[in-house]
UniProtKB/Swiss-Prot annotation:
Localisation per UniProt entry: Cell membrane
GN (gene name): PPE66
Pfam entry (one): PPE-PPW
Any one of the GO BP annotations: response to host immune response
Its membrane topology: Multi-pass membrane protein
Protein origin, superkingdom: Bacteria
Family named by the database record: Belongs to the mycobacterial PPE family.
Keyword annotations: Cell membrane, Membrane, Transmembrane, Transmembrane helix
GO CC terms in record: plasma membrane
Chief site of localization: membrane
Protein name: Uncharacterized PPE family protein PPE66
Spans through the membrane: 81-101, 106-126, 133-153
Amino acid sequence: MTTAYASALAAMPTLTELAANHTSHAVLLGTNFFGINTIPIALNEADYARMWIQAATTMSIYEGTSDAALASAPQTTPAPVLFNGGAGVASALPAISAATLDPASIIGIIIEILIQLFLISLEILFAIVAYTIIIVLILPLVIFAYAIVFAVLAIIFGPPLLVIASPFVLTGSVIAVPTSLSTSLSTAVPIGVGQYLADLASADAQAIEVGLKTADVAPVAVRPAAAPPLRESAAVRPEARLVSAVAPAPAGTSASVLASDRGAGVLGFAGTAGKESVGRPAGLTTLAGGEFGGSPSVPMVPASWEQLVGAGEAG
């Protein structure tokens, strides 16, 4: 049994070989650009399968050897049942606890777990990097291939489609022209502008009519209301209450009123008068006394107004 166990342990693949195989597999997958590592990856997977087959064969041989050894061992009679087995159980507990809590086995288990976690994280990292590189390199090629395919399809099927769609395009154009004209006119002219133009025309006509009527006005006689004459007071003549005679008001004088042929003129401030000879301002404006070393008049007023009486040039 001991020899069979030692032989099986020596024939089994070691953890170092398994870790090296996993690392090589991750590196090959991460650098497999355009399938350049296809053959090395296949060899790596074949080596991994070989290790599995080797381990399975070794375990099968060891299982057969152990079964044969157990079958060839002499069968002993079972031990009698012990009613008071406290001493034996108590003596077996330290051995069981020592075998279970062996520091070497615990450290080995922890190391194996850490190695597996490292290998798994390394595979995930290499897979992410590999797929990212593959996407970055292949995506432009895929887009370029699609562009070429669509360009070829457009060259092949473009002219027949244009010939088929030309009647529909002409029909749409004929329908769209009057619609676009009506839409543009409705959006260009504001709502209610017709009423505004009609009111403006009627206002201009009324202004012209009033002007013509003003020009043809004839002198009009106006009879101003005369003030009632002063009569004697009732205190002087008490009988005025009984007999009262109403004297007719004297006839007033007629006055003629004509429309003026000039307006009120240019209005300004008090104490100033406008000059009709001064033209409308145009271009730059030059103040009086604007030569070098001069000073403005006090007070400074527009050039179209007379200066105030007594205002002189400032020295």
